[in-house]
């Protein structure tokens, strides 16, 4: 067997299947694009669902990829086992209705055993098949020549995710030798059993059935192949190491951690776990941040926060008690640079994000640990082995402890966490709810007439908004029809069209189709699975027929607004990078005729001054009258030019490059102005945060910007009228009114203070003597808690030595304030305990220091009773 690096194995896999006629699908972003069913891309097939379910027909039905993936369902096992990871790479070859079992099995065996490729000894390979999959069994036994004793039938060899495509699978296992298991009595010592000797290196799924809603299975019209090979696992076999962490994918990170910690890997099992956790988690976080995710308290951002804080916790085992994870980013970038250059390109930004998060956690870690230690001690003293949900939530909400981190500390003390209680607290704090994602099926059922339409349709709308065309297909409710009549809702495909189909954030065009017999209003345009533009509309009059000649005309005013807004988003994107930093990336957009919406990654708020600069830059570029050039270029040439790619989009070998002078350069398939002067004016309407690390700007251009500014001027004029002022004097008038208001508030405070003194003086006659101590417990008039506290302070000063508790009713609620002079504290009198006693009577709570405390209550009618209970408490102490 050859010794290969991880980079060589990855490239060898892609090259092998490229030779077999497969198209190499680039690794997609870890952040799913337009797939609400996934938090992360979690497999090689996840990014190909659109091909498997028929929404899009691939140019080549044979696909191969190396896909970065994240799975977080078993984080607690990472570092404690040989092969659990949160970030990993899946190598896979796929067939969308092309080849099937024979080719998949034959090629897998060739790749693994041929000296040209991996070069495994065939005698060390075994396979598993489903008991009823006779075809796969026969192929392994007769075509490949695997001995029957190394073909194991396992009931679990069936891939099924519920409704949708499913089928049997076959797995290939490598025998690592007797040093990993040689006990004849071990019932799990076989390929497919729970053991370390026989390692699964490849899983081939034969998707040949549809799992129907009623639980039955029917054959698929087009059978698919979906295979998966974990790169880390495969490399561990090739490099002959005991765990994935000992491969060249992880060891440079572990070695860097050794240098930081001064500790050694491979000497102590507990410390080895820490090294592994750190190595795994920094890979995940670095790649996720490079793809636009940022630490937060919800969704995927919460996963990153949890991983970083788990790593910090384990780092303490190695004696590391400072931010350090960010120092490992260049190491991760260096390992993966050959295939994933994005981490290296963004390593400064990634390191900054990680360092900021580490510093934030270190600030609260020690305080949080002290609180947790007290909680654990308290529960143990009570004889309890459970940390309450309230305490877990407090640690999460106040100190940033993920519940899983608290759970790990609890396990160290042989305690458990009250998860139900924690979830109940989370429910009360809905704004901190982690994520409520749509429950969307991960695979749709094959089918639909649109998928089978292969007739070509040409888009001519970049240069024209009107064209003569022929109807090549008509559909109603997803079914092909030959004609449609007045009032019918239809989908129409033309041989050529000026109508843009919704994509890249730009909405589909609206307009009209006219034939000699019919008029059809087009309300929207979308792309069919094979790329044609599907015109959705209603027959206004007459009858439209398949084969009819039509004049297709886009609503000119609508398109005019769209192109202005689309080019403006390109200018805005570059302006954001100029002002906020190069880390800014597009995270989504919407371009309509009336306005534009642009979502972008940024981990801080955008200040008013920054927004003004951004808006100013965009308008300067508009007024410079810059020509907009659009060219088709090879993808590599476009990238070398520095063209920005859109978030989540995938591109072919030839791409459309939109260039605004020397200012903006993007890959884009949308419609644009020919010169920035056509945009006229750009005005930001709003800027806000829409999620962890993602901001949104909404803006208008041209006529819309003019109307927006007029609206703002009208509002300003209305304010001036109300203030009885000129528009230009509005700021001065407001400042003058604010000064008058402050003066009135000061006078009000002074009057209230005087009234308070009067009232305080008036109630001095109500002081009681209890056991030689002056006691005053009275209901008073006070506007708020501050006023009440001031009265208590004044009375303490007047009486010299006294216990005072005052109560007031405000807005149907009770305020209580208590004070004890220093000389009486030594006698056991305590303002906090006294006010707590009173508050409980009127349905509230509170407390404070021995000399000063406050509380609140819900039942004003019980205030007198509450004050009486305070007096009783004083008597009990004295």
UniProtKB/Swiss-Prot annotation:
Residues involved in Zn(2+) binding: 566, 570, 668, 672
UniProt keyword ATP-binding present: yes
Cofactor annotation: Zn(2+)
Gene Ontology, cellular component aspect: cytosol
Keyword annotations of the record: Aminoacyl-tRNA synthetase, ATP-binding, Cytoplasm, Ligase, Metal-binding, Nucleotide-binding, Protein biosynthesis, RNA-binding, tRNA-binding, Zinc
HAMAP family, per database record: Ala_tRNA_synth_B (MF_00036_B)
Protein name, UniProt field: Alanine--tRNA ligase
Species name: Bacillus velezensis (strain DSM 23117 / BGSC 10A6 / LMG 26770 / FZB42)
Lineage: Bacteria, Bacillati, Bacillota, Bacilli, Bacillales
């Amino acid at each position: 067997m050859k010794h290969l690096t991880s980079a060589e194995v990855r490239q060898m896999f892609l090259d092998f299947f490229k030779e077999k006629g497969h198209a190499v699908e680039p690794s997609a972003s870890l952040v799913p694009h337009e797939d609400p069913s996934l938090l992360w891309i979690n497999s090689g097939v996840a990014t190909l669902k659109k091909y498997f379910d028929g929404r899009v027909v691939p140019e080549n039905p044979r696909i191969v990829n190396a896909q970065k993936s994240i799975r977080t369902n078993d984080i607690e096992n990472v570092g404690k086992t040989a092969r659990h990871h949160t970030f990993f790479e899946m190598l896979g070859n796929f067939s969308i209705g092309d080849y099937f079992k024979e080719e998949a099995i034959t090629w897998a065996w060739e790749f693994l055993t041929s000296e040209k490729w991996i070069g495994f000894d065939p005698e060390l390979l075994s396979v598993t098949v489903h008991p009823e999959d006779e075809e796969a069994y026969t192929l392994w036994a007769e075509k490949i020549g695997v001995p029957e004793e190394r073909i194991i039938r396992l009931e679990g060899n069936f891939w099924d995710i519920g409704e949708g495509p499913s089928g049997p699978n076959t797995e290939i296992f490598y025998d690592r030798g007797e040093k990993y298991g040689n006990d004849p009595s071990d019932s799990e010592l076989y390929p497919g059993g729970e053991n370390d000797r026989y390692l699964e290196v490849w899983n081939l799924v034969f998707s040949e059935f549809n799992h129907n809603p009623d639980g039955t299975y029917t054959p698929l019209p087009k059978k698919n192949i979906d295979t998966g090979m974990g790169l880390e696992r495969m490399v561990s076999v090739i490099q002959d190491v005991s765990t994935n962490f000992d491969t060249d994918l992880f060891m440079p990170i572990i070695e860097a951690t050794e240098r930081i910690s001064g500790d050694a890997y491979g000497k102590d099992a507990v410390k080895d776990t820490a090294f592994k956790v750190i190595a795994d988690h920094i890979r995940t976080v670095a790649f996720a941040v490079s793809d636009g995710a940022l630490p937060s308290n919800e969704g995927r951002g919460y996963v990153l926060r949890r991983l970083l804080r788990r790593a910090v916790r384990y780092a303490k085992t190695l004696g590391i008690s400072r931010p350090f994870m960010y120092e490992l980013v260049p190491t991760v970038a260096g390992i993966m640079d050959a295939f994933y250059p994005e981490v290296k390109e963004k390593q400064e930004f990634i390191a900054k994000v990680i360092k900021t998060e580490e510093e934030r956690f270190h600030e609260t870690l020690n305080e949080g640990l002290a609180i947790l230690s007290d909680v654990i001690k308290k529960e143990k003293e009570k004889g309890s082995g459970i940390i309450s949900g309230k305490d877990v939530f407090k640690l999460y909400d106040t100190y940033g402890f993920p519940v899983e981190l608290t759970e790990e500390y609890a396990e160290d003390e042989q305690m458990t966490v009250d998860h139900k209680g924690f979830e109940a607290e989370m429910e009360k704090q809905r704004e901190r709810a982690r994520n409520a994602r749509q429950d969307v099926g991960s695979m749709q059922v094959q089918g639909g007439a649109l998928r089978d339409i292969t007739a070509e349709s040409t888009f001519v709308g970049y240069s024209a908004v009107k064209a003569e065309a022929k109807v090549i297909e008509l559909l109603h409710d997803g079914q092909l029809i030959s004609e449609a009549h007045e009032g019918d809702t239809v989908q129409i495909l033309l041989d050529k069209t000026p109508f843009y189909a919704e994509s890249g954030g730009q909405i589909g065009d609206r307009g009209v189709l006219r034939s000699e017999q019919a008029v059809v209003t087009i309300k929207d345009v979308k792309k069919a699975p094979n790329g044609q533009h599907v015109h959705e509309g209603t027959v206004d009059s007459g009858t439209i027929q398949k084969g009819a000649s039509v004049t297709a005309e886009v609503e000119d005013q609508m398109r005019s607004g769209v192109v202005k807004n689309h080019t403006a988003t390109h200018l805005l994107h570059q302006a954001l990078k100029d002002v906020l930093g190069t880390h800014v990336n597009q995270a989504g957009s919407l371009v309509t005729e009336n306005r534009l919406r642009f979502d972008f990654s940024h981990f801080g708020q955008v200040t008013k001054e920054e927004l003004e600069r951004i808006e100013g830059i965009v308008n300067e570029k508009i007024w410079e009258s810059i020509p907009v050039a659009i060219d088709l270029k090879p993808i590599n040439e476009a990238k070398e030019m520095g063209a920005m790619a859109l978030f989540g989009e995938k591109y072919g070998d030839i791409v459309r490059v939109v260039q605004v002078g020397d200012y903006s350069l993007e890959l884009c398939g949308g419609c644009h102005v020919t010169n920035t002067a056509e945009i006229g004016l750009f005005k930001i309407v709003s800027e806000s945060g829409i999620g962890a690390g993602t901001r949104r700007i909404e803006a208008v251009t041209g006529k819309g910007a003019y109307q927006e500014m007029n609206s703002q001027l009208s509002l300003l004029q209305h304010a001036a009228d109300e203030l009885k002022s000129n528009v230009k004097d509005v700021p001065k008038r407001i400042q003058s009114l604010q000064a008058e208001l402050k003066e009135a508030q000061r006078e009000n405070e002074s009057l209230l203070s005087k009234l308070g003194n009067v009232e305080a003086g008036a109630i001095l006659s109500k002081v009681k003597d209890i056991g030689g101590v002056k006691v005053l417990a009275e209901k008073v008039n006070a506007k708020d808690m501050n006023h009440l506290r001031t009265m208590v302070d004044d009375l303490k000063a007047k009486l010299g030595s006294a216990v005072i508790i005052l109560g007031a009713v405000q807005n149907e609620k009770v305020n209580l304030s208590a004070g004890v002079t220093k000389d009486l504290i030594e006698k056991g009198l305590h303002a906090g305990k006294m006010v707590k006693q009173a508050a409980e009577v009127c349905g509230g709570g509170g407390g404070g220091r021995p000399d000063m405390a406050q509380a609140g209550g819900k039942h004003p009618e019980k205030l007198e009773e509450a004050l009486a209970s305070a007096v009783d408490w004083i008597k009990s102490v004295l």
